[in-house]
Amino acid sequence: MIKEYREKYNSEFSEETYEKFIKYLDGLCGHKIEFRIAETPIFLPDHLLTEIISASDELTSAISTKEFHDFTRNAIPPGLETPNEEPHPSLLSIDFAICKGEDGKLHPQLIELQGFASLYCYQELLNEAMRKFFFIPERGKSYFYVKDHEEYVEEVRKAIVGDTDPENVILMDIEPEKQKTYIDFLATEKYIGVKPVCITEVIKRGRKLFYKRDGKEIPIERIYNRVINDELERRKDVKYNFSFQDDLDVKWIAHPNWFYRLSKYSMPFYKSKYVPETRFLSDFEKFPDDLENYVLKPLFSFAGVGVMFDIDRKVLESIKDRENYILQKKVVYEPIIETPDIPAKAEIRLLYAWDDKPLLLNNLVRLSKGKMMGVDFNKNQSWVGSSIAYHNRTF
C-alpha cells in the first residue's frame, strides 16, 4: 500500500527465496508450520495507520466503561462463568478489515475484538525471518509502543509471566502438539520460557493446580490459556481434573470470562464510524429488505464456524434462539495488495497487553483472495495466508 515499497518488494521476489524463507522459519523452532504463510508482508501508509490507531483507541476506551460491563453482563453463557474476573482483559486483539471508503481512501472496519491469546511470539519469529530473506525498509517496523525485539519480548514476558518463575506458568491447550498454532507455543517457550501443557495433565489439589515435570509436581501460579471454549465443548473425549468454574488459586492470562465479553456479543455496543452496523437478531421486529448486504453470525463460535453470507428472510425466521445471533452489515474488503495475479485483501489484527492500561505491541495480518479469510476460501491460491504489517512511524 506504500507504492514504492510494493513495487520494489514484488520486483525482487522469487519463489526460490520464498521456499528458503519457509524452510528457515520451520527450522527456527524445529517444527513444520501447518498454516499457510503469505509470500508478502503489507506496508501501511501513514494515513491508514492513523485511522487504525484512532479506531483502536475508541474501542479500548469503550470497553473500559461501566456501560460496557453492564452491556456484556449476559455475554457469558449460564454455568460457564469463571470466578475472580479481572476488570479488563490482560491480552486483547482487535481485527480490522482494510476497506475503501466513498472518498476513495483506505479505512479500517472492525471485524472483531478478542479478550484472548493470539500469536504474540510466532509473529516475532515471522518478523525475524521476513527481514532475513526479503526487502523490508530500513525504517519499517511491526512494533508500536516498543522500540525493538528485546523490549517487545520483555513486554510479552511481563504480560504472561509477570513476577512469577516461568516454571510456575503454563501455556494450556487441548493436545497442544496437535494444534495448528503449535509453532507459537514453541516460540513462547523459546522467548519467555513458558512450556505448553495439555489440559488433561493438570492436577487439582484443593484450590491449587499442579503439573508434572520429570516426575515432580510443579505448582501452577499462572495459566496462559489457549483453550478454545467451543473446542472443549465438542471434545467429549477430553477428560480433565478441574473445572473452569472452580474458585482456583491461579491467575488467568487472559481470564476466560473475557473470551465471551469481548466477542461478537459486544459488537452491537460499539457506536463508531469504524464499526459496521450490528444488532442482535432478536432485536429486529422487521428484518431489513436488503438482506444481501448483511451477514449472519452465531455469537458463540470460533474461526468463522456457522457464519452465513447468503441469507434470506426464510433462513432468519427459522432460527428459534435469535438472541444467540447477530445480523451485521457486510464489510467489503478492498483488494489492495498487488500480487503476481489478482490483488489480495487484508485484515490486520492489533496485539495488546493490558496491565494498568492497554499497550499496543505488535500486529498480525491475514491475506485472502476468497470470499472470506481462512484456508477453506483460498485453496490453490498464492500470496495469501499469515503475514505481518510494517509501518514507518516512531511512537
Per-segment meaning from a language model:
Residues 1-395:
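Preference for protein termini
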